[in-house]
């Protein structure tokens, strides 16, 4: 699982100065302190940012949210359902989320809560920033990843309006999905 999630799940942008051009007209969601701070420096204000006030587990800077901050607890290496619900609320209300614990995997509920056509950015250590264009297929891709997690996956799927008893893809979609994401 860690190996699967360690590789970029979108387009790796090595030169972040390109972000204003790549994100023109997009609603932006960011995950991570460094990614959020760099976006702000470039004049890109995320609708929602998910951060923990640290970088690489050491104390860092406090980010100033334009529309308020919700708080969530999320243990390292997990997606706590309560934290996922806070992220969903933040996406709906254009607020930011400060996480006690680890924010990395909260990119998944952020993506699932976002509208198609938006963009999600998260850092890829020592490589750049990963840009995920949010659409039906990226959502299905991350839902497939969620199915591999331990815990109450069905409750998580229901929270994000997916019926765990229904197939996620139709036959035509499945073939296209396999072309887009062959590693799963």
Swiss-Prot record:
GO biological process terms on file: coenzyme A biosynthetic process
Q: Which reaction does it catalyse?
A: 3'-dephospho-CoA + GTP = GDP + CoA + H(+)
Q: Which UniProt keywords apply?
A: Coenzyme A biosynthesis, GTP-binding, Kinase, Nucleotide-binding, Transferase
Task: Give the pathway listed in the UniProt entry for this protein.
Answer: Cofactor biosynthesis; coenzyme A biosynthesis
E.C. number, please? 2.7.1.237
Q: Which GO terms describe its molecular function?
A: GTP binding; kinase activity
The main enzyme category here is: transferase
For GTP, which residues are the binding ones? 33-34, 52, 54, 103
Q: Which HAMAP family match?
A: Dephospho_CoA_kinase_GTP_dep
Q: Give the UniProt family note.
A: Belongs to the GTP-dependent DPCK family.
User: Per its database record, what is this protein's job?
Assistant: Catalyzes the GTP-dependent phosphorylation of the 3'-hydroxyl group of dephosphocoenzyme A to form coenzyme A (CoA).
Which PANTHER family would you find in this protein's record? Answer: GTP-DEPENDENT DEPHOSPHO-COA KINASE (PTHR40732:SF1), UPF0218 PROTEIN TK1697 (PTHR40732)
Record-given protein name: GTP-dependent dephospho-CoA kinase
- What is the organism field in this record? Ignicoccus hospitalis (strain KIN4/I / DSM 18386 / JCM 14125)
């Amino acid at each position: 699982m860690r190996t699967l999630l360690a590789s970029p799940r979108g387009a790796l942008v090595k030169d972040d100065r390109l972000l204003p051009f790549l994100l023109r007209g997009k609603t932006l969601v960011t995950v991570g302190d460094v990614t959020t701070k760099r976006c702000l420096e470039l004049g890109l204000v995320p609708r929602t940012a998910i951060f923990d006030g640290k970088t690489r587990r050491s104390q860092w800077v406090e980010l100033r949210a334009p529309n308020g901050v919700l708080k969530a607890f999320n243990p390292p290496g997990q997606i706590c359902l309560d934290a996922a619900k806070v992220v969903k609320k933040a996406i709906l209300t254009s607020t930011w989320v400060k996480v006690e614990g680890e924010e990395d995997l909260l990119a998944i509920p952020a993506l699932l809560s976002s509208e198609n056509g938006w963009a999600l950015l998260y850092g890829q250590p020592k490589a750049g920033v990963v840009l995920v264009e949010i659409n039906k297929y990226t959502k299905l891709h991350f839902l497939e990843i969620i199915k591999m997690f331990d815990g109450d996956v069905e409750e998580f799927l229901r929270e994000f309006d997916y019926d765990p008893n229904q197939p996620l893809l139709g036959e035509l979609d499945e073939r296209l999905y396999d072309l887009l994401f062959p590693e799963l």
